[in-house]
C-alpha cells in the first residue's frame, strides 16, 4: 500500500522493462473517435479529427465550428462540413480495437492494484500500472518523467476523475506517451483537466467544462458538455 498525498512512485526496473508507446496507427489523428456517436452541449472546442463508425453520421452531434480538424462520417447524414469516408473510419475503428488489446495485453506490470485504485495525490513515475478494480482520481495526480517515458494504465473497472481535479505532467512528460485502457466507462468531472489517450471499452463522458490534452477513443459513445479536447503533439 502506498500512502496518498506525498508519495513519489518509482517503477520497478527489475520486474518490468520500459514500455513502448501503444501504436494507434490511423486512429492517432483523431481527438475523438466513437462507434455509437458523439453528443454535445454547445459549445465545445475540439482540436483534431472527429469520427463515428459504424453508426450514421447523424449521430455526430458537433457543429462544424466546434472542430479544428476533419469530421469523418460513414454517410452524408453528418454535419455539413463532414467528409464521407467509411473506409477511413473502418480502418481507424479497427486500429482503436487493436490499440486497446495492445494496452490491455501488456505483461509484467510495475504495480498491481496500487492504493486500491485511489491514485489521487500521487506522483507516478513511468511504467505499467494494472488494477483489477475501478480507478478514482479524487485529488490531483502528477505523472513525472522525461519526454520519451511511457505510462500505460490497465483498468479492469471504471475510471472516474472528480470535479475540478487535474492530471498534470511534470519533468518533460508528454501526453502522447500516456495511455489509459479502461474496460469500464470513463468519467471526467466538471472543470477537471486530463492528460493522455483514453482507450475505453465502453463510453467516455466529459462533464461541464472539463478539458483533455489527449484523445477520447471509445468503443461506444462519447458525451461532451462545453469541453475542450486537444490532440497531443505527435
Q: Across the structure, where does each feature detected by a protein language model lie?
A:
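Secretory targeting and sorting signals
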Residues: 1-13
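Solvent-exposed adhesion/ligand-recognition segments of exported proteins
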Residues: 12-234
Amino acid at each position: 500500500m502506498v500512502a496518498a498525498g506525498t508519495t513519489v512512485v518509482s517503477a520497478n526496473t527489475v520486474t518490468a522493462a520500459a514500455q513502448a508507446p501503444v501504436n494507434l496507427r490511423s486512429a492517432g489523428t483523431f481527438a475523438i473517435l466513437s462507434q455509437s456517436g458523439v453528443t454535445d452541449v454547445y459549445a465545445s472546442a475540439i482540436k483534431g479529427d472527429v469520427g463515428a463508425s459504424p453508426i450514421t453520421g447523424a449521430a455526430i452531434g458537433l457543429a462544424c465550428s466546434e472542430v479544428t480538424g476533419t469530421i469523418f462520417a460513414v454517410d452524408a447524414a453528418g454535419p455539413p462540413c463532414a467528409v464521407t469516408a467509411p473506409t477511413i473510419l473502418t480502418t481507424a475503428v479497427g486500429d482503436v480495437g487493436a490499440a486497446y488489446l495492445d494496452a490491455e495485453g501488456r505483461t509484467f506490470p510495475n504495480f498491481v492494484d496500487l492504493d486500491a485504485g485511489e491514485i489521487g495525490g500521487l506522483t507516478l513515475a513511468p511504467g505499467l500500472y494494472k488494477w483489477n478494480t475501478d480507478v478514482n482520481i479524487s485529488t490531483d495526480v502528477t505523472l513525472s518523467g522525461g519526454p520519451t517515458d511511457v505510462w500505460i494504465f490497465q483498468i479492469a473497472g471504471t475510471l472516474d476523475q472528480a470535479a475540478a481535479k487535474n492530471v498534470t505532467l511534470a519533468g518533460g512528460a508528454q501526453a502522447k506517451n500516456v495511455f489509459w485502457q479502461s474496460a469500464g466507462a470513463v468519467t471526467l468531472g466538471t472543470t477537471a483537466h486530463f492528460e493522455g489517450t483514453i482507450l475505453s471499452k465502453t463510453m467516455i463522458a466529459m462533464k461541464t467544462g472539463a478539458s483533455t490534452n489527449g484523445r477520447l477513443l471509445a468503443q461506444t459513445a462519447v458525451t461532451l458538455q462545453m469541453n475542450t479536447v486537444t490532440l497531443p503533439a505527435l
